[in-house]
């Protein structure tokens, strides 16, 4: 018995095979307008991750923006900043960004690891403060 691969209901491919009007899987794409810009604390070129939350957490689709410390390495990162975008009543609402960190092992960490974690937490805090200052400066220019 052979099975035929099913065509996805939606395409999650970013590759357009050189044709901006068609996705790699062959689906036609339509430009519906500009995307929501990333938060100012994101690194250039950051792409969000789309996830479907379980009913326990509202059952909605979220678009998560994340920046990792050390820079750009989600596997080795002990610290990260994250914020979520949600579409509610036709509007995009963004949560406040928060700094997260991994739980230390049961046996604790040594002085070198503690210093590295402290440095990464400070880098994340400085990055978030810099992003907020950028937003404040932008608000001043709009007045």
Curated annotation (Swiss-Prot):
Name it.
Uncharacterized protein MT2723
Species this protein is from: Mycobacterium tuberculosis (strain CDC 1551 / Oshkosh)
């Amino acid at each position: 018995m052979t099975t035929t691969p099913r065509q996805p209901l939606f395409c999650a491919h970013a590759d357009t095979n050189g044709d901006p009007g068609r996705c790699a899987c062959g689906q036609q794409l339509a430009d519906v307008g500009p995307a929501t810009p990333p938060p100012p604390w994101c690194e250039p070129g950051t792409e969000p991750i789309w996830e479907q939350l379980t009913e326990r957490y509202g059952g909605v689709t979220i678009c998560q923006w994340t920046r990792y410390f050390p820079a750009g390495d989600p596997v080795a990162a002990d610290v990260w900043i994250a914020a979520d975008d949600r579409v509610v009543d036709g509007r995009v609402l963004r949560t406040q960004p928060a700094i997260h960190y991994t739980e230390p092992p049961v046996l604790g960490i040594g002085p070198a690891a503690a210093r590295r974690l402290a440095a990464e937490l400070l880098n994340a805090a400085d990055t978030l403060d810099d992003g907020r200052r950028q937003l404040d400066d932008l608000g001043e220019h709009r007045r």
